[in-house]
């Protein structure tokens, strides 16, 4: 039998550089496995307000 999907959770990623620049923040949603990745996720994603790739960190 297949295992359940209780280890995957939906998280929100928010741009860190947009707050410093004074423009609206960009947010992305994704999933992560909370068993394998216990610390907060940091990914490089595109911010359409800044028109460049920036660091996005996981928020609560």
Swiss-Prot record:
Leader sequence residues: none
Please tell me whether the keyword rRNA-binding is annotated for this protein. Answer: no
GO BP term, pick one: translation
- Tell me which UniProt keywords the record has, alphabetically: Ribonucleoprotein, Ribosomal protein
> Superkingdom of this entry's organism?
Bacteria
Q: State a single Gene Ontology molecular function.
A: structural constituent of ribosome
User: In the UniProt record, which is one GO cellular component term?
Assistant: ribonucleoprotein complex
Q: NCBIfam families given for it?
A: PRK00504.1, PRK00595.1, rpmG_bact
Give the protein family. Belongs to the bacterial ribosomal protein bL33 family.
| Name of the protein described by the UniProt record | Large ribosomal subunit protein bL33
Q: Which organism is it from?
A: Chlorobaculum tepidum (strain ATCC 49652 / DSM 12025 / NBRC 103806 / TLS) (Chlorobium tepidum)
Organismal lineage: Bacteria, Pseudomonadati, Chlorobiota, Chlorobiia, Chlorobiales
Gene expressing this chain: rpmG
